[in-house]
Amino acid sequence: MRMLLHLSVLALGAAYVCALAVESPMNRLVAETLTLLSTHRTLLIGDGNLMIPTPEHKNHQLCIEEVFQGIDTLKNQTVQGDAVAKLFQNLSLIKGYIDLQKKKCGGERWRVKQFLDYLQEFLGVINTEWTIEG
């Protein structure tokens, strides 16, 4: 019986480690996009004269629309070819994913307790994951 318990715990631990090792498709897409961005940076900069509004705020979650407007500007001003096509395709897929996630923001009406639980979690995220500027 004791041996069975040890084997069960060992199997559970192995399953947990395997689950951590598996990346989500979005994480892989973002990693690939970062690599493409680094690879094609010089091509994207071009002659350096293009001016794109860039958010000053460091909390990128608050500036998603501005970031994607900048991406559209960059895409429209960059010579399209095989070199950057995959980059802009990936950025479009990431935007689509974010748009789908934003649709989850409009939720149902909940009792005050559930809202306060959500608010507490929200403030915890701000406190731990956002860069608070002075």
Swiss-Prot record:
SUPFAM superfamilies: 4-helical cytokines. Homodimeric cytokine expressed predominantly by T-lymphocytes and NK cells that plays an important role in the survival, differentiation, and chemotaxis of eosinophils. Also acts on activated and resting B-cells to induce immunoglobulin production, growth, and differentiation. Mechanistically, exerts its biological effects through a receptor composed of IL5RA subunit and the cytokine receptor common subunit beta/CSF2RB. It is found in: Secreted. Homodimer; disulfide-linked. Interacts with IL5RA. Interacts with CSF2RB. The keyword Secreted applies. Keywords: Cytokine, Disulfide bond, Glycoprotein, Growth factor, Secreted, Signal. PANTHER family: INTERLEUKIN-5 (PTHR48491:SF1). GO terms for biological process: immune response; interleukin-5-mediated signaling pathway. Pfam families: IL5. It comes from Equus caballus. The lineage of its organism: Eukaryota, Metazoa, Chordata, Craniata, Vertebrata. One of its GO terms (molecular function) is growth factor activity. Residues 1-19 form the signal peptide. Belongs to the IL-5 family. Its main location: secreted. GO terms for cellular component: extracellular space. Glycans are attached at N76, N90. This is Interleukin-5.
